[in-house]
Structures are given as structure tokens and as C-alpha cells.
Amino acid sequence: MFNVTKKSIEWGGETLTLETGKVARQADGSVIATLGETSVMANVTFAKAAKPGQDFFPLTVHYQERYYAAGKVPGGFFKREARPSEKETLTSRLIDRPIRPLFVDGFKNEVLLIVTVLSHDLVNEPDIVAMIAASAALTISGVPFMGPIGAARVGFAGGEYVLNPDVDDMQKLRENPEQRLDLVIAGTKDAVMMVESEAYELSEAEMLGAVKFGHEAMQPVIDMIIDFAEEAAHEPFDFSPPDYAALYAKVKSLGEAQMRAAFAIREKQDRVNAIDAARAAIKAQLSEAELADENLGTAFKKLESSILRGDIINGGARIDGRDTKTVRPIISETSVLPRTHGSALFTRGETQALVVTTLGTGEDEQIIDALHGNSRSNFLLHYNFPPYSVGEVGRFGPPGRREIGHGKLAWRALQAVLPAATDFPYTIRVVSEITESNGSSSMASVCGGSLSMMDAGVPLKAPVAGVAMGLILEDDGKWAVLTDILGDEDHLGDMDFKVAGTENGITSLQMDIKVAGITPEIMEQALAQAKDGRMHILGEMSKALSSANSFSAYAPKIETLTIPTDKIREVIGSGGKVIREIVETSGAKVDINDDGVIKIASNDQAAIKKAYDMIWSIVAEPEEGQIYTGKVVKLVDFGAFVNFFGKRDGLVHVSQIANKRLTHPNEVLKEGQEVKVKLLGFDERGKVRLGMKMVDQETGQEIQPEKKEREEAGEA
């Protein structure tokens, strides 16, 4: 009944297994990949014909994590998986980016790839396993896919690269100074296709070494998929790339001159309008059959690409007049919004980001519910890309995959320089509003985010800047690396290479390559140019702000104290009674962590002090020999009970009330009276013994022995 194909190798200290033929047999390609005890199933289906008139490649990738994979039940009212989490969205993009360029040019049939996590051992990250499963499923499906690809995660600890570090090592990257890198790489046998990383100020050489290490480490996986496909692959889909040479030749002859003139216009919107006019002029001269040809859009793109790329390769001139190494003009401004905690307006050419920082308390932290367990994040970065930023009418609604991905890239770039939570106990939310875009808006978010946080008073370890690099690589081997690319250069070029970091090193690297043939020499040149660009941008940013401003007057003040964990219950009280009383009485917000760290927040310093004192009175232990102010709560024949330390009471024996003989404490005391007492010690049952007669009730100072003797002699 089942025709099962199964292959296994030892890889990175774990067993990697690929299996097909038993599950999801009606899909065009189905593979279950297992690394350790983490199993991921990838299923590929594709339409056998393209939709009429379709001029793009409709590839859809869905990565989904099932809670049962880790033995968990989903939270929420409905108790089932709902919309994709941020991690699922990011992993979907992680799978999509390296495989999309590997489909045969001209293939426009719809392809659906669904990747599902079936089992998670909480050691091996499922994203790498998912990429391998997806690659294998595509390779055996028969779809015209020029793979396979392999994938690997690379860490860097103690000066050594580490293949596929454990989940725990990566989850607490920010808290572990030994672990300085989380890099995911994907590629074919001969070429790197995609890199995604967060780093802690690594040098260009260290980052390039990580890329090389990862590419070498994935080679056994690629060989395994090839062997696997030789036994399990379906018949290749009968597809021949369309021949549109005649159509392209006609489009070129009719409109190359006008299109070239349009690309010579430096202002983006004027250039866009001129390109649209050139297209319209060409279309006006085409026949109905040529206008209906589904390859017309491809022919236009090829013409535009040849003009832009040829000018750069042959003359070194870009469409906005810059050479290949120049960064566009930069204007940085801070404190642009009066009532926000921190704000910055970062403008680089025709790309602009308005970035705002808000400081919150512990209750504002994001709770992340993941397969490996719940966690909290005190740093949030949200990226918004409205249609008006590119002068268009378009979809407006919740953030899409691109916005989530760009926001995460900026998050990775900035989180490496954040202060430790113990030094700066705030939740930090950064929002980047892209108000203009002509390339590299995510890197503008990094620059604006750094300025905005410093404007809010966040003590960053160092300012961070980012730059997007591009590449033109021709078939004859000529190439050029471009610094600070425009939108058209991104669209028509061969590489999108984003680098962010400080003066000391790289904090984030993202690379997407559309062609094979990217050599180490090209990558070295790109990293070197990116460093020069980053240093220039940091210099321009420093003109606006070079270090953290004074703390925003509108941000909440936070003080922390650490208490013994066995005292947490006392601070919270039965049913939360005590903590509610503290909050209501003081007016401050109080957040208690399981490790005994308490954060007290308020805009009013007096409220913070009140809450602090109330908590301290509960958890602190009174010291023998110290003098305290208390209140008489009860009088009995043998003495007075005094509340002197938070909710703690002690007994002042009748003999310790005054320097004279008393028959009853009510001769000198009454309930509710404020008194000064000295802690004499504890009896054999642990009860507190207090004294009054040795304390001056007016000053609260201890009466010196000589004075006490004189008082006693006078009374005698």
C-alpha cells in the first residue's frame, strides 16, 4: 500500500532523516524531515496550467506550528491555532526567499507550499528542518525547480563557529555574552541564496566566515536530497520557457530611446510617470495579439533592466546620478513630536522614516507563546508602510508579511545595543512610520530607531546605522556593487544585501540573491562598501544626536528592588490583597517577577517612594538595636503592643515603658499614640521585644547612659 523512500545522515551531531510515500500521497510532493526528534512535513501542490493573462509567478508558502508538536494546548477561548504568529510569518518568508529565484524563468503556474511542524524536541529549531523539508518536497514534486537548496543555522561562541546551536542557546542570545551570532543561511550546491542574522558587533571577516562555514556545512544535506530525489522524484512537469525574443525585439525597437530618456530623470515620481508614458507609447504601436501576449510585461521588464544595468556596468552612472559608492544626502532630526517620549525624522534621499519611541512598564512587555514555552520581550519594533509612501493607492490594513519582516530586521539590528533590563527596567516600543520610500526603508527604520531611542533617553551601548547594498552581475562576468540602492535598483538588480551595525561591528545582516555566481570576492567587496557607507551614515546621524538625551519628562519613572523569592507571597498577599492595597494607596504600578525583581512605576516620584516603602516594610527584617517610630495598637496589663515595622508588632513590657514604676501602661500611653521604640531583641519564641524608656520621645534619639542615670537619681 505504501511505497516509502527514506534516507538518513548524521549531521551536526544529530540524525537527519527524509521520508516520503506514506503520508499526503495526493500532493505533488510530500516529505517529512526529522532532525533529532523535531519533525516537519512539507507538502507541495501546483497548478498544471497558468491562469490566462497572468504575468507573475504566484508562489505561496505557509509555515505553521501545531501546539501538539510540543505537547501543548493552545491558549485563548477557542483553544485552537488561529492566525499566524510572528514567528510563523517570518519562517514562511525564510522558506520563500531562497526558493523563489530557483523556479524556471517564465513559469507562472500557481504553486502552494504548506509546511507543518509535527513534533518539536525543544532542542532543534524547526525552521531549519522546515527549509530542508520544503526543498526536498519541491525537488521530488516535478515542478520546474532548479534546486535543491540546503539550510543551516550558525552560531559563534568562544571564537568558534557552531553548527545548529540548541534552541536555548538562541532564545537567550541577548543574555549570553558568549553567544554572539544567530545566522540562518540557505543555498544551492554552488551558491548562497539567502542569509538572515542577528549579531553582537561582529567584524566583516567574522560574518563572511560564518556565511562560508554555513554553506560548507549544508553540502551533505544537499547531496542527501539529490540521492533521495533519484529514488522518489515524480516525472518532471512538461514545461518549456516561453520564447518572447521577437516581442522583446519589437518593444525595444519601438521604445528604447524614450525609455532610456525616462530613466535619465532623477526625481522618482517624474521618472515613474515618464516610464509609464514610454510604456503607453510602445503599447499604442503593438497589435492586439501582441498586447494580449502574457509575456509583454516580461519584455518591458527586460528592456528596463537592460537600460539600468547597462548604464551602471558600462559607465558607472546610476539613475539618480550617483556613482556606485555614494550614499544619498541625509537629514536627521530628533524631538520632532512634542509629547512623545522620543522621536526622530530620518531622511535619506527620497526615503524617509518618522520613528517614535515609547517607554512602558513591565506590564507592557509582550508575552510570546511559542512551542518551546512562554517568554516575555521588553523590546518591540513595529514597521508601517502605507501606500502614500510610494505615491500609490493600495491596500490599507493590518501589517502584511513584508511589514512584519522589515520590522523584525530592524529589531535584530537594534536589540544588540540595548541596555540590560537590570540597568534600564523599561519596555521599549519603537514604531517606524515610512512616510516616503525609494529603497532601503528598513535601514531608514534602523537609523531612525537608534536616534529615536536616544532621544527618549535610552542609554544605548552605541548608535546603529544600516545601509542596503545591491549588485549588478552580467553574464559576461562584469559586476558592480551598489551602495544605498534605490527601489528600481532593488527590483532590477541581482542582490539585496542589508547590513546594519555600530562603529565596532555588524549587528544584523540580511542577504537575498536572485542569481548564481556570487563569489566570495563579491561578498567581501559588498561588506567593505557597506562598512564605508555605515560609517558615513553614523557620522551624519551624530550631527543630530550622538548620545542619549535626558530622560523624557512624559515617560514613567521606574525603580526596582529585589526581594527574597520566599517573600513574594507576603507582598502579594492572600488573593492579591496586599499588592492591591499598595497600588491603591500609593498610586504607582507594581510588577513582581518570579525571580523576586519588583518594578515600581509612576510619573510621580512620591508615589514610587510610597510604594517602595510599603513593600520594604513587608520584606525587610527589623534590626536589633535600631530605633523605629510606631503606633500603640493595644494596651494590656503587662505592657503595650506597638506596630513599628510595616505590619509587624512588638511588645513593650511595662517595665520598659518609662523610667518609673507603672501599675498599668495606660498611665502614660493610649491606643493610637505614636511612640519611638528601640528593638531590644527577640524572646525564645521569636517574639519581638521593644523598649521605650531608653529613647527620647521627642527627638527619637537614644538617651545616653549618663542622662538616664541623672533622670533616675532626680526621680528618686
UniProtKB/Swiss-Prot annotation:
Its EC number is 2.7.7.8. It catalyses: RNA(n+1) + phosphate = RNA(n) + a ribonucleoside 5'-diphosphate. Residues 556-615 form the KH domain. GO terms for biological process: mRNA catabolic process; RNA processing. It comes from the Bacteria. It is an enzyme of class 2 (transferase). The keyword RNA-binding applies. It is found in: Cytoplasm. The keyword Metal-binding applies. Its main location: cytoplasm. Mg(2+) binds at D490, D496. Its cofactor is Mg(2+). Residues 695-716 are annotated as: Disordered. GO terms for molecular function: 3'-5'-RNA exonuclease activity; magnesium ion binding; polyribonucleotide nucleotidyltransferase activity; RNA binding. Belongs to the polyribonucleotide nucleotidyltransferase family. PANTHER family: POLYRIBONUCLEOTIDE NUCLEOTIDYLTRANSFERASE, POLYRIBONUCLEOTIDE NUCLEOTIDYLTRANSFERASE 1, MITOCHONDRIAL. Involved in mRNA degradation. Catalyzes the phosphorolysis of single-stranded polyribonucleotides processively in the 3'- to 5'-direction. This is Polyribonucleotide nucleotidyltransferase. It comes from Cereibacter sphaeroides (strain KD131 / KCTC 12085).
